């Protein structure tokens, strides 16, 4: 019978690797808590209309990449390809603006896109997102960018590049699209196939083309910065000024447009600079029309998302995980000893000791060997002799010293045991 394997583009995150995920998650959640951002969790599947209306029907995500299906009730369902649309749907549905006019939110979880799997890119992947809903102020844009940069700096990632652009408002882009289309039409036959299709439907998306020949053609194309309204110019200038005040260097990239239609004004990407080139690990921008577009009252917002697989690839070497060890390993032999061991396990769990009980029924020599493999600080030994004398043996594996105490004494020695474990764990040789 053929083995059942994980679907292409998905990956098991095994215990040795999950430690790094947990480390990053804990680090980021603490930082965001300090900035008074609240965690929010939304379903991983939504009505497909949410993404048709929110992301845009002319985008690659909606046209090529969504996992879309009809359920048993014939509802059109999509596994979420990104997080912002679901957050906005929740914001509207749960009337969150009635509770607080400003919402600082963050989320983390799996997303799904049918893309070609490669290093750092899977069909099921994970994003952590930051959303600031309710403010038009340029300080909101700058705060979101500052938080993203702070996350990377806290993970000892410093060789970063922040690309920044303003794509203006809908009215600005409408005028710009005409000028850009007129320019690119002259080079229609020289454009890549995708760009030829976009020339009619959404020419601004051509700026994001990865085709080298198309990029050469774009060097002389009109720049969106020349078509911004005074309001958009002022907003972008304010964002740049705040970033300077925050000592965050940036590079203005006039071709940066992002891949989602809901953005306006500020758009940005954060890339890592390595010997192998650049890799985008964070992208975001302002989306002032999305709440209204999805049926809510017009509400400004700005946010970003970080690709966790990509982040892990570059941050892993900088993460110094604490030693994997346990406090007590419980070794028993015999029915009565097993019963006593289970009772001690329960008590030590309640006192928040990290423990493991051996259930192999091996001899004590093998059980103690296993305790050493698990890097236990101490091994609690309970055999026929201990049962007969009404005691347990604690063998401190670091020093090889051991002591005999009763179960009652154990229960009154929690503070002493915690201090001793801390002493051994803090030893340089441990």
Curated annotation (Swiss-Prot):
| Record GO biological process | histidyl-tRNA aminoacylation
Task: Tell me the InterPro entries matching this sequence.
Answer: aa-tRNA-synth_II, aa-tRNA-synth_II/BPL/LPL, Anticodon-bd, Anticodon-bd_dom_sf, His-tRNA-ligase, HisRS-like_core, HisRS/HisZ, HisRS_anticodon
UniProt-annotated location(s): Plastid, Chloroplast
Look up the EC number in the record and give it.
6.1.1.21
What CDD domains does the annotation carry? HisRS-like_core, HisRS_anticodon
Q: Which UniProt keywords apply?
A: Aminoacyl-tRNA synthetase, ATP-binding, Chloroplast, Ligase, Nucleotide-binding, Plastid, Protein biosynthesis
What HAMAP family does the annotation carry?
A: His_tRNA_synth
This protein's name: Histidine--tRNA ligase, chloroplastic
| Species whose genome carries this gene | Pyropia yezoensis
The gene designation is: hisS
């Amino acid at each position: 019978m053929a083995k059942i394997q994980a679907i292409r583009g998905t990956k098991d995150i095994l215990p040795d690797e999950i430690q790094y995920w947990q480390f990053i998650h804990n680090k980021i959640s603490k930082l965001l808590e300090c900035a008074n951002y609240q965690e929010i969790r939304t379903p991983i599947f939504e009505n497909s209309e949410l993404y048709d209306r929110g992301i845009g029907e002319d985008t690659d995500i909606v046209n090529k990449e969504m996992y879309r299906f009809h359920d048993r009730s014939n509802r059109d369902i999509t596994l979420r390809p990104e997080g912002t649309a679901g957050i906005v749907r929740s914001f509207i549905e749960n009337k969150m603006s009635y509770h607080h006019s400003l919402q600082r939110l963050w989320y983390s979880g799996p997303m799904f896109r049918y893309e070609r799997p490669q290093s750092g890119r899977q069909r099921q992947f994970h994003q952590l997102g930051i959303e600031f809903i309710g403010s038009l102020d340029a300080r909101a844009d700058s705060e979101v960018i500052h938080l993203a940069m702070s996350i990377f700096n806290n993970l000892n990632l410093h060789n970063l590049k922040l690309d920044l652009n303003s794509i203006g408002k809908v009215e600005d882009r409408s005028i710009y699209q005409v000028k850009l289309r007129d320019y690119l039409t002259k080079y229609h036959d020289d454009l890549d196939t995708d760009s030829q299709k976009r020339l009619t439907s959404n020419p601004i998306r051509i700026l994001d083309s990865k085709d080298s020949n198309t990029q050469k053609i774009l060097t002389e194309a009109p720049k969106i910065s020349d078509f911004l309204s005074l309001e958009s110019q002022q907003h972008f200038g304010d964002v740049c000024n705040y970033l300077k005040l925050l000592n965050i260097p940036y590079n203005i990239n006039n071709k940066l447009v992002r891949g989602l239609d809901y953005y306006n004004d500020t758009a940005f990407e954060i890339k890592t600079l390595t010997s192998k080139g650049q890799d985008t690990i964070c992208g975001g921008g302002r989306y002032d029309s999305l709440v209204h577009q999805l049926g809510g009252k017009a509400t400004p917002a700005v946010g970003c998302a970080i690709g966790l697989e990509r982040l892990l690839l570059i941050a892993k070497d900088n993460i110094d995980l604490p030693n994997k060890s346990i406090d007590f390993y419980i070794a028993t032999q015999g029915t009565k000893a097993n019963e006593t061991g289970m009772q001690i396990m329960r008590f030590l769990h309640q006192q928040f000791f990290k423990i493991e009980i051996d259930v192999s029924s091996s001899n004590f020599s093998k059980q103690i060997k296993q305790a050493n493999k698990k890097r236990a600080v101490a091994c609690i030994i309970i055999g026929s002799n201990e049962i007969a004398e009404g005691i347990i043996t604690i063998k401190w594996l670091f020093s090889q010293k051991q002591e005999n105490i009763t179960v009652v004494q154990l229960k009154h020695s929690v503070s002493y045991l915690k201090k001793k474990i801390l002493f051994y764990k803090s030893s340089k040789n441990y």
